[in-house]
Amino acid sequence: MKQSVGHRIFLLSPAYAGGERARMILRGQAQFPLARQLRGKSGAPIADVFTFLSGLYFRGKIAYAKAFARAPRGTSGVLVITPTRGLIDARTRIHLDDLREFAEVDIHENDPRYRMPIDRDARLLGKKLSDQSEVILLGSIATGKYVDVLLANFGQRLRFPADFVGRGDMSRGGLMLRCAADLQELSYLPVAGAIVNGKRPPKLAPRRYTGHFASGD
């Protein structure tokens, strides 16, 4: 049975697993803490790994989503889109082999290695949510790689932050980190029919963070 009250679930676009920072962490001789975690038996949370790979953008996404998610009982409110594993809880621990697998697949809406798992998970999630619930995509809506499969499963429930329009990744990351620290939630627009290009907003003023916002934890 669907929930009778609205919930808010966040879907975070993934960090690129084929770049230089990924190669750093995949090197067998890497000795920094996160690399050792990935090689260890317990692995490392995917949120920590993607924050390392992506920097400010993913750090902002995870902080923002944690601050404002409202999930049904038994469902994670913060899910990460992956190249091959569908939607997974941001707390899920991964290992080096998982990261290597992600690096082998460039996300494209027509690649079944990506499309089939995310379609499966989005369909299951959609059944748990009421029509009043919102699924917030913290990622690009300018191409079909995320939007096509998610819109097919969530319809009008799929939304994105209005303030993303006109901003690049770094600006979006800084904005979300600031909003999470101030507990000021952004407004959202339906993805269906959205205008994806707009005037670039003013540059954010520099800001220092303390505590867990300083490290992205």
Predicted regions located by residue number:
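Peripheral peptide segments
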Residues: M1-D217
